[in-house]
Amino acid sequence: MSETGKGPDALVEQRGHTLIVTLNRPEARNALSGEMLSIMVEAWDRVDNDPEIRTCILTGAGGYFCSGMDLKGADKKPPGDSFKDGSYDPSKIPGLLKGRRLTKPLIAAVEGPAIAGGTEILQGTDIRVAGESAKFGISEAKWSLYPMGGSAVRLVRQIPYTIACDMLLTGRHITAAEAKEYGLIGYVVPDGTALDKALEIAETINNNGPLAVQAILKTIRETEGMHEDEAFGPDTRNGIPVFLSEDAKEGPRAFKEKRAPNFQMK
């Protein structure tokens, strides 16, 4: 339960074919909690297993995305204690999208700070939208902590090496404009409109052929790190079933008839 009694630490809502996951601890700048991570893991499972869900959006309540670990709460129990006493729970790590990539597109809608764990979660999303006042950073080294959400591995693969090392080793924060320049995010929008833009993008994807979208994303996932020649194998294997589907007939037929296609995921 959120500390202010405003409900669970993360909210899950389905709008049409889109599942919206909202981090809901605004009184703590949406700092991570065990409850929040558990709800996120359940939401990712729901996205993967429910054929009616075609896209997912991750956002935060109260003008904050996520400020990472709750350092104030660390006074009660130092971060390292869970590794010593056996209370560390690895089942919650997939909530951070570390070692867990969804089978459907995940869009981040960022307002305000996305610091430490906030930027770590961001790296597991596919399309990223941020309000112009958003801030990003990996601050763990400042407090002699380690970015356990995977940034020491992922960030250098997603943005230029020297920028990633700068952020990881100095702990400096960057603006939304800088994040877009470096390729960490794709869209900068007026403050307060990130979710609207994310919903617009999700609806565009939802109107596309879901078999094609999911096959494309599967290829992207499977071929990360592969040599190009090796990657063409899964590329072909994932593409052929799409062409053999009924939806592959419906798409061109709808184009010819100048109407919206009615995809059945068959």
Swiss-Prot record:
Catalytic residues of the enzyme: E120, E140
Keywords: Cholesterol metabolism, Lipid metabolism, Lyase, Steroid metabolism, Sterol metabolism
SUPFAM superfamilies attached to this UniProt entry: ClpP/crotonase
Reactions catalysed, as given in the entry: (22E)-3-oxochola-4,22-dien-24-oyl-CoA + H2O = (22R)-hydroxy-3-oxo-chol-4-ene-24-oyl-CoA
Pfam families (alphabetical): ECH_1 (PF00378)
GO MF annotations, alphabetized: lyase activity
Disrupted-gene phenotype: Not required for growth on rich medium.
Function: Degradation of the cholesterol side chain involves 3 multistep beta-oxidation cycles, this may be involved in the second cycle. Hydrates 3-OCDO-CoA ((22E)-3-oxo-chol-4,22-dien-24-oyl-CoA) to make 22-HOCO-CoA (22-hydroxy-3-oxo-cholest-4-en-24-oyl-CoA). Not active on (E)-3-OCDS-CoA ((E)-3-oxocholest- 4,24-dien-26-oyl-CoA) or 3-OPDC-CoA (3-oxo-4,17-pregnadiene-20-carboxyl-CoA). Hydrates the same substrate as ChsH3 (AC I7GCU8), but the 2 enzymes make different stereoisomers of the product.
Protein name: Enoyl-CoA hydratase EchA19
GO biological process, one term: fatty acid beta-oxidation
Subunit-structure text: Homotrimer; substrate probably binds in elongated tunnels between the subunits.
EC number: 4.2.1.-
CDD domains hit by this protein: crotonase-like (cd06558)
Keyword check for Lyase: yes
Annotated segments matching region Disordered: 247-266
Biased composition (Basic and acidic residues): 247-260
Biological pathway: Steroid metabolism; cholesterol degradation
UniProt family annotation: Belongs to the enoyl-CoA hydratase/isomerase family.
InterPro entries (alphabetical): ClpP/crotonase-like_dom_sf, Enoyl-CoA_hydra/iso, Enoyl-CoA_hydra_C
Statement: the UniProt record of this protein carries the keyword Cell inner membrane: no
